[in-house]
Amino acid sequence: LEVKVILVAGNNKNAYAFKRAKFYGIKTLIFDRIFFNTGLFKTIKEYEPDLIVLAGFLWKIPPLWTSNFSKQILNIHPSLLPKYGGKGMFGINIHEAVKINQEKETGITIHLVNEDYDKGEIIFQKRIRIPTNYKVEDIIFKVQELEKKYFPKIIEEYLLNEK
């Protein structure tokens, strides 16, 4: 299986993914809320993707997308869902909550996207222990290590198994 990225799209023009995509000659598309709500679905549909991968994308995916791309939208979330999921639970908010609640472990969840924030079918989770002396920054670093290590592998495995 050859995994090929055909488009990198997002609403944050400063996202590192755009620099990386340009380096590899991959098409990019930066969009605003208006285009997201009116034109992005049609544009993505024209690309005929096997999979739509979300990483750091915070806007809710509309039902039009989840019904037309059923089991084709994968997201990574920096917690062990269902804990610390849902609206407002992203980035440092999650890791601060994990620390405040003195969780013994955290991790990542890779899941399918449905109509509800962070409620789609869980495809993969990886846990790490949190030593009591860890600061929020340490937790962030460890979780990002997991994301980098496992997300590409799980994307490839998912594509292999869905064919």
Where do the PLM segments sit?
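One-carbon transfer enzymes
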Residues: 1-163
